[in-house]
Amino acid sequence: MRPLTQDLSIFNQLDFERPPVGVKFQFFRPQSMKPMDAQKNLSFCEMLKETWEADEPFYFGKENNEACVGKILLGMDAMEPFAESGQIGERLGIFQEARANYIFYQYVPKFEKGIINYVAFSPLEKLTFEPDVLIITATHGQAEIVMRAMTYSTGELYQSRTTPVMGCAWIYIYPFQSGKVNFIVPEMVHGMKGRELSADDSILISIPYHWIPVMTQNLKEMQMHLPSHAGKEEYLAEFGGILGGLAEKSKRP
């Protein structure tokens, strides 16, 4: 794995309750990193929590147990025909009929068989490799700052893509494959809500490697906490002052 060359310490200034997590997809086994405890039986999304709680970075491999659809999405296992037909989602009450569950599978991002054999995880403070995806768990206020760091110098639109199940595909795989920053509300994803992945007011933001340098630099440059966000009175005063000043200045362009 390529050693970390970026200074990502600016993210610490946002005081996240849980540290950002760097994720790396690997064909070959990561060196100088311990495997995930063989006794663990976690879902792919729960490996975020495991990263927060573990003492050191670790990697997950196809020899490890996985309690949900992670191995299927990573191309390590095939989906059972009864599951692929949509039977599970109907029985969970998520979909009216199996057909609706089946139809949405075509939209879920996944890796081809045999491409990914290992996935490395590290909390930001112990990150030593260049991550493929940096995953942030944020409050709504923190999420506003992180997402603004994307559009600050680029004008890029905010976009959120997910599905009611297989939400882990949209925080791990979709950003990596598409090169787009994605954010989701865990409470809107069946498994994440049921497994109590994060606090009720959380937003998960996934930053692919393409965007990490841009957003890091923008966080360093921009004003994180805007005066207008202090309250309605401050917002109206600042906005009104700017409009008045521009109206006056525009008389003599």
Predicted regions and their residues:
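Acidic, serine/proline-rich low-complexity intrinsically disordered regions
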Residues: 3-253
